[in-house]
A protein has these predicted regions:
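Conserved alpha-helical substructure of the radical SAM core
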Residues: 1-119
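Flexible loop residues that form catalytic
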Residues: 33, 102, 126, 192, ...
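Structural motif corresponding to alpha-helix initiation and N-cap regions
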Residues: 40, 79, 83, 106-107, ...
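Radical SAM enzyme [4Fe-4S]-AdoMet core and its adjacent flexible, acidic
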Residues: 16, 37-41, 115, 119, ...
Length: 354
């Protein structure tokens, strides 16, 4: 009899505390006026509801969960009660990651994050100084790098993350050197989502061939002390995917939307992913269990037969499914409204893994 315990199921909550931000990045997926923000008591109630639901799932299915909270914005450091929010999340046993532009981080904030504790911090960095400042605003590069150094000094694990487009994809080697020189432990990458302000950059999206070339190059780097990571499901389909060293990473189970994660917006609205901004409920008024089980949107995301184009025929569907947010945003740009279309940057053959 096999008594081996099942592996913990990685499940993440991405909680956006605010859509306020001190920057106005050209590729940002946010649009429109900032919504109402949940109060600290409302956030505490939401976190408890999430925790209770995950505990119930674990007992019902006899599978241990490894839940994580990605806390972000907007710029989460604009919340004056951030410390209290993080403590509420930590007290429920969640692993916490903070996603920030890094420009507001100083010694005191770094010490606070380390004391919670926050497990890791992602700082957005789009390339060398002139490229980063073109995308995120003059002076933001220096502030972000200084913020990362404060985090490292406080003993936190730091990831630089670059949003790839034709504006900055050619600078990936520079980012390797920059990240290694700054002493960060990880360098991550994702793709431009042509949504919100980012919709104006649709002409800067990488072609499928360019996407593949950049990903192959990125995952082939071997720099002591620096790990290459990404949440992009397409990365798992590159020829380098099987050669990743320990500490490097990409999603083995494909796009997380509807499968292994959910997003909570500042007012409590639930969506499959922040960049796939289709409301499916509200954490303050709806049962997370009911939303997860019965949402038509989530169930469509889990059904291969509902997908369109290459994704509907692909032998790698269960390991990839493309980025649903990019597929959706691209469909909107073409006058459609379909989150189940094929990923427009897909570079894999439908019948085979590369």
């Amino acid at each position: 009899m096999d008594s081996k315990k099942p592996e913990p199921f990685d499940f993440f909550i991405q909680m956006h505390l605010t859509e306020r931000c001190n920057l106005a990045c050209t590729h940002c997926y946010q649009e429109g006026p900032a919504p109402r923000e949940m109060s600290l008591p409302e956030i505490a109630a939401a976190v408890k509801k999430i925790s209770d639901t995950i505990d119930a799932w674990s007992q019902e299915y006899d599978v241990p969960f490894s839940p994580g909270f990605n806390v972000t914005g907007g710029e989460p450091l604009l919340r004056n009660d951030l410390k209290e929010i993080l403590r509420v999340i930590s007290d429920h046993g969640f692993t916490i990651f903070l996603l920030t532009n890094g420009t507001l981080i100083d010694t005191d904030i770094s010490a606070m994050l380390a004391s919670v504790p926050v497990k890791g911090v992602q700082v957005s960095l789009e390339g060398p100084e002139e490229v980063h400042d073109l995308i995120r605003g003059r002076g933001s590069f220096t502030s972000a790098v200084n913020g990362a150094r404060h985090l490292i000094d406080a003993g936190l694990t730091v990831t630089f993350n670059i949003t790839l487009s034709e504006i900055n994809a050619g600078y990936f080697p520079d980012m390797i050197s920059l990240a290694a020189g700054a002493g960060v432990q990880k360098l991550g990458f994702s793709r431009l989502v042509p949504y919100g302000r980012g919709s104006s950059l649709i002409g800067k999206m990488l072609s499928p061939e360019r996407t593949r070339a950049i990903y192959e190059e990125a995952l082939a780097y071997r720099v002591p002390g620096l790990h290459i990571v990404t949440g992009d499901p397409l990365a798992s389909q590159t020829g380098e995917a099987g050669n990743m060293p320990e500490g490097g990473g990409f999603p083995l189970g494909g796009c997380a939307a509807g499968i292994s994660g959910i997003t909570v917006l500042p007012d409590g609205t639930l969506t499959p992913c922040r960049r796939l901004g289709i409301p499916i409920g509200n954490i303050l008024t709806d049962s997370l269990r009911e939303v997860w089980a019965n949402s038509d949107v989530l169930n469509a995301l889990r059904n291969k037969e509902a997908y369109k184009g290459k994704c509907s025929e692909c032998a790698r569907w269960s390991q990839c499914r493309g980025c649903r947010a990019i597929a959706y945003a691209y469909s909107l740009s073409q006058g459609r409204n379909d989150f189940l279309e094929e990923d427009p940057q897909c570079f894999i053959d439908t019948g085979d893994r590369l």
